[in-house]
Amino acid sequence: MSDMHSLLIAAILGVVEGLTEFLPVSSTGHMIIVGHLLGFEGDTAKTFEVVIQLGSILAVVVMFWRRLFGLIGIHFGRPLQREGESKGQLTLIHILLGMIPAMVLGLVFHDTIKSLFNPINVMYALVVGGLLLIAAECLKPKEPRAPGLDDMTYRQAFMIGCFQCLALWPGFSRSGATISGGMLMGVSRYAASEFSFLLAVPMMMGATVLDLYKSWSFLSAADIPMFAVGFVTAFVVALIAIKTFLQLIKRISFIPFAIYRFVVAAAVYVVFF
């Protein structure tokens, strides 16, 4: 593979990762399809995907740095809570409660989960995840009990964490599982999405570091330019995707995302079967 060709592949996959990582459409499904079409598969490809995920995580940190510092009691500039707003406050405890279920299951069944990374499982996960998005839109309370992040209860945070366990099924979509769970628990669509992004930082960071540690032997100095291009591309595109997504969900439901998931599932079937 020539240098220019590998850098082009890195840029394309970085765009795919950045666009899909935090949308409820399954980045795994997209990466499997695009990687296959580009002929970029195998151990190096898996390690590359782990590295560019760090770029997406960095985008969330940049977007929500004020809120993330606030979770540990460090506030910059204006306070997060204004007069007339909820007397509640999103805390680190909410994040920990949201992390525990999937973190425990992920650590215990890490190798088993990795064995599920194949097109047929991803295809089924895309469909089931789409059905969950539709169910969340149809069954959510008419008036959310938690309109904003600071209105969320510990119970809601923990239940969202339980829904996040569904994302251990490759192709399900972590954001799709957590946002759907939040809406079913009475959290507004926007607040559930914000919480999903905040929850992504420790969850994805932990999983990515673990994967990177186990994949370290597949890294070589010759891969650094390719990995760097993928990382930077994923970071920039993820920033744009997150901002656009948060504006978009103020105006539309998640039904279009569910339909899109069904289309991607069909694409997986066509490409691999």
Swiss-Prot record:
Short name of one Pfam family: BacA
GO annotation, biological process: cell wall organization; peptidoglycan biosynthetic process; regulation of cell shape; response to antibiotic
Chief place where the protein resides: membrane
GO molecular function: undecaprenyl-diphosphatase activity
Disulfide linkage: none
Intracellular or extracellular location(s): Cell inner membrane
Catalytic activity: di-trans,octa-cis-undecaprenyl diphosphate + H2O = di-trans,octa-cis-undecaprenyl phosphate + phosphate + H(+)
Acetylation found in the keyword field: no
Keywords, comma-separated and alphabetical: Antibiotic resistance, Cell inner membrane, Cell membrane, Cell shape, Cell wall biogenesis/degradation, Hydrolase, Membrane, Peptidoglycan synthesis, Transmembrane, Transmembrane helix
Membrane association type: Multi-pass membrane protein
Record-linked InterPro entries: UppP
Record-listed E.C. numbers: 3.6.1.27
A GO CC term assigned to this protein in UniProt: plasma membrane
Membrane-spanning parts: 6-26, 45-65, 90-110, 116-136, 190-210, 222-242, 252-272
Source superkingdom: Bacteria
Main function: Catalyzes the dephosphorylation of undecaprenyl diphosphate (UPP). Confers resistance to bacitracin.
Family classification: Belongs to the UppP family.
Miscellaneous comment as given in the Swiss-Prot or TrEMBL entry: Bacitracin is thought to be involved in the inhibition of peptidoglycan synthesis by sequestering undecaprenyl diphosphate, thereby reducing the pool of lipid carrier available.
UniProt-recorded name of the protein: Undecaprenyl-diphosphatase
Organism in which the protein naturally occurs: Salmonella arizonae (strain ATCC BAA-731 / CDC346-86 / RSK2980)
